[in-house]
Amino acid sequence: MLYLSCFYDIFILEGSDSMKTVVVTGSARGFGYEFVRLFRERDYNVVVCDISKDALKEAEKKLLDIESKGKVLTYEVDITNEDMVSNMITSVLKEVKTIDIWINNAGVNQPDKAIWELDKKVIDRLVDIDLKGTILCSKLIMPVMIKQKSGQIYNVEGYGSNDAKKLGLSIYGTSKRAVTYFTEALALEAEERKTNVLIGMITPGIMITNFINTSLGDGEKIELDEKTKKVYNILGDYPETIAEFMVDKIIANKKNNVQFTWLTNRKAAWRFMTSGFNKRNFFE
């Protein structure tokens, strides 16, 4: 699906241009929204970037209910479209002094099918959004941050980033594994070129959102089997819980090539050990 620049809407609300600014892609809902909500609570200017106009309007309303000194800027953008991302960056910099933090969060899930059952269009869209969108956004914001002599870019990992495999996640997992390599390579380049830009990875683990049972954004539903639900009930968490942890880490960070992990091996092991008497059910 092609999203032309003529459908590119901008909603700019009053605030201060002296605050730090964070851009989060795919932030009208779910994990991304929790990021902009929490940064707004901390008086950041927040840039909500998403492909869904309706979701953007709803996010805008909720964010305006939060008392903050920062601005709210919302953009309907397809992150695979270079002109749209570039135009958004230009527009943001007319409203604020700097873009201090950029979080590549936008992504879509894979239909629960084997690789040979997927149409090429589905494969292309998965790779375009989950991998190439992250690369493109990083490419476009890096020169801005280099010119500022400061900035932070974080890429959100997913299943497959740690080389895990699962039936029905072949393309999604491949894309996320590549995102990990790309992030490490970008961190190396940023360091060797002495850019003063910090690069990092956000590893949230299993989040209980519509993402886990919906493919390609608002596409077909994914039916989770009982075994998968059991694992999600043990290891999963709501996005607001994970985002709270991540935002504090990001604000405090002063290092390049970092990885912020919510579901550590120790935490996962403890969850399994205590699952017999600590019952949770996200699917009731």
Locations of the language-model features?
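C-terminal helical subdomain
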Residues: 201, 219-277
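Catalytic Tyr-X3-Lys loop
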Residues: 116-135, 150, 154, 179
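Conserved glycine-rich Rossmann-like NAD(P)H-binding loop of the short-chain dehydrogenase/reductase
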Residues: 44-58
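The beta1-alpha1 cofactor-binding region of Rossmann-like NAD(H)/NADP(H)-dependent oxidoreductases
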Residues: 53-54, 75-87, 120
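Canonical Rossmann dinucleotide-binding motif of NAD(H)/NADP(H)-dependent dehydrogenases/reductases
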Residues: 17-47
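Conserved mid-core segment of classical short-chain dehydrogenase/reductases
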Residues: 86, 109-124, 168
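Catalytic loop of short-chain dehydrogenase/reductase
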Residues: 154-178, 183-184, 188-192, 206
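A short, exposed helix-loop element centered on a Lys and neighboring polar residues
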Residues: 138-139, 184
